[in-house]
Amino acid sequence: MDFVQTTVASFISLIPVTLAQSLILSFVVLGIMIPFRMLSFPDLTSEGAFPLGGCVCGVMLAAGASPLTAIACALLAGFAAGCCTAFIHLRFRIHTLLAGILMMTMLYSINLRIMGKSNLSVFGAPTVFDWVPFVQPGFPVSKIIAAGLIALIVFILLNMFFKTEQGTAVRAVGANPDMAEAQGINVWAATIGGVGLAGAFSALSGAVMVQSQGFADVNMGLGILINGLAALMIGEAIVGKQTVLRQLTAPFVGAIVYYQLVSLCLAAGMPPPDLKLATGLFVLAMLALPSLRRGRSRGPAPAREAFRE
């Protein structure tokens, strides 16, 4: 009983901090969802774009730039990284996963070049959290409000974008590139723009995270991809993925639930080094579950998702 009470008390005390962190990291999950679901383009650039945005933001803040300017520069850098991944795939016919691995590897050196060292402290620099009224800056409440407002704006803009002609073109390319090209859609522009948009959101997450934690590090994106996949799967299991609205909602819901589950595991005494193992096993189970269900049933196997190569 004492163990349960201690675990519950620790979990409740961590909820504000975890909620703020999950809202910030939900943009990475969004950056994973867009190429994966909208474009059928499995992409690994997020693991490099996340620290890229953090490094760019950290350098800009250290140079005296405003928080919004630093975030804008991080967005541009992440967009460029995503565009490069899509270009490598399209121009040189390299598999999407290999193109993402190449870009992620190169971004590590680029991040080191940007900062000039492996980590950079920006503690005390102005942040977007300082602008939240009636709340003391640096406290979880200010981070929840600021990150939640950014998430709401991003959600509304993306929902509007995917209802436009350009957004529909991106979805059409993901559904069937050959048919989209036959309909006069520029497959290159839609693919490069969509993957670039995903990279921009991953970089946005890194930039806001740096302003939240007060430092940038080249290794801050280590394991973020598998965490994002786990969060995306949880979100899709909760809200579904049948419509654009649900697909856009899933990353935010999944990120909040996933990081609360991580917080619960930590409160229960799970060693932090074991979290990545547990997350990997969870993702493996989610991916293997449909196959196991088909093995038990005698009905016809459902159609497999087709991804671009």
Task: Cite the ranges covered by each PLM segment.
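Transmembrane helix-bundle core of multi-pass membrane transporters
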Residues: 96, 100-103, 107-163, 193, ...
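Transmembrane alpha-helical segments in multi-pass inner-membrane proteins
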Residues: 202, 206-277
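Single transmembrane alpha-helix segments in multi-pass membrane proteins
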Residues: 12-66, 71, 87-92, 233-245, ...
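Helix-loop-helix "hairpin" substructures at the membrane interface of multi-pass membrane proteins
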Residues: 66, 81, 139-225, 230
